[in-house]
Amino acid sequence: SRGLGDVYKRQTCSTAYDLDAKAIITVTKSGFSARMISKYRPGCDIIGCAMDEKVCRQLNLSWGVRPILLGEEWEVFVLFERAINACKRDGLLEKGDVTVITSGVPIGRSGTTNMLKVQVVAD
């Protein structure tokens, strides 16, 4: 039997495929979500947004994951906005791109991925 977390990872990849998303953005405390999404080899970029430099370095070893350091933040929608802005800054996303964002709430607790959001990148 698969756990609920695995269902979220598979659904994230399926949603990205169905919407022809440019990227999957995973806001992650430990990097686990980004690593688990990478095992499904989605056909789009995986951007692992971490709050810790050590986690970013570890994500460099995961297939298809592009790590971005966000720094600490405990408000989920502020983190999402910072993640989108960092991706635009680094040339990974531009206006009109569809993204699938995943995270756990409450922020900062490993193993709690329970949120999936589809967002079209604005200006």
Region locations from a protein language model:
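ATP-dependent carboxylate/acyl-activation modules
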Residues: 10-24, 28-42, 47-98, 104-123
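Short, small-residue-biased leader/transition segments that mark boundaries at the very start
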Residues: 1-8
